[in-house]
Amino acid sequence: MNSRIMFIGGVPGVGKTSISGYIARNTDIDIVLSSDYLREFLRPFAPQESHLETSVYDAWKFYGDMSDDNIIRGYLDQARPIMGGINRVIARALANGEDLIIESLYFVPDMMDEMVLKNAFLAYVYIDDPDLHRSRLEDRINYTHRNSPGSRLAAHLKEYRTIMDYSMDMARGRGIGLYSTDDYALARQRLLDDFRKFVDRR
């Protein structure tokens, strides 16, 4: 039997953690991984130029003044070791015939092997409305991140939404589905339905 693998990307506050849990419960997938923990594991070993010791919203500082280009340069520096790890985790799950969901801030399909891209369901979730996005960040302490106040992240909404726009462009270029979570219940159901269709076609 083929592995059922979902790789879901999105910046903080868009609902990827809770959606991943919802899909796992509704598909009986036991393994759900967050790139936050992969990043924490890699920090002592990652090359210095990846700047993984720095929060992603500050990684632009290694390139000078804040600009969209520098935000993305810092993001991609951090993404390289993370995406390398994600690529290998998915390849291992495929080799073992295991089911897996990975949710990640870092979502750069161009850094993944074509074999992995062909055999995993990729999706990117986002929020259209910046005010709603800010509100969701501030509320997430009540749901999924009880010891991580969202106000700290909301202060960097500009950086996160720059990363979001870049990632959405990359996803469009690869024909990867985009899912607006402005209507959260609708988005998670669409994702679940599309994932099931992907699995059934394989």
UniProtKB/Swiss-Prot annotation:
Reported function: Phosphorylates mevalonate 3-phosphate to form mevalonate 3,5-bisphosphate. Functions in an alternative mevalonate pathway, only present in extreme acidophiles of the Thermoplasmatales order, which passes through mevalonate 3-phosphate rather than mevalonate 5-phosphate.
Pathway where it operates: Isoprenoid biosynthesis; isopentenyl diphosphate biosynthesis via mevalonate pathway
EC code: 2.7.1.186
Temperature sensitivity of activity: Optimum temperature is 60 degrees Celsius.
Gene3D superfamilies, per database record: P-loop containing nucleotide triphosphate hydrolases
Protein's UniProt name: Mevalonate-3-phosphate 5-kinase
Organism whose genome encodes this protein: Thermoplasma acidophilum (strain ATCC 25905 / DSM 1728 / JCM 9062 / NBRC 15155 / AMRC-C165)
GO molecular function: ATP binding; kinase activity; phosphotransferase activity, alcohol group as acceptor
Catalytic activity: (R)-3-phosphomevalonate + ATP = (R)-3,5-bisphosphomevalonate + ADP + H(+)
One of the protein's GO biological processes: isopentenyl diphosphate biosynthetic process, mevalonate pathway
Other remarks in the entry: It is proposed that Thermoplasmatales adapted the classical archaeal mevalonate pathway by replacing mevalonate 5-phosphate decarboxylase (MMD) with two specialized enzymes (mevalonate-3-phosphate 5-kinase and mevalonate 3,5-bisphosphate decarboxylase) in order to produce isoprenoids in extremely acidic environments. It was found that at low pH, the dual function enzyme MMD is unable to carry out the first phosphorylation step, yet retains its ability to perform decarboxylation.
InterPro entries the UniProt entry points to: P-loop_NTPase
pH dependence per the entry: Does not demonstrate significant pH dependence in the pH range of 6.5-9.0.
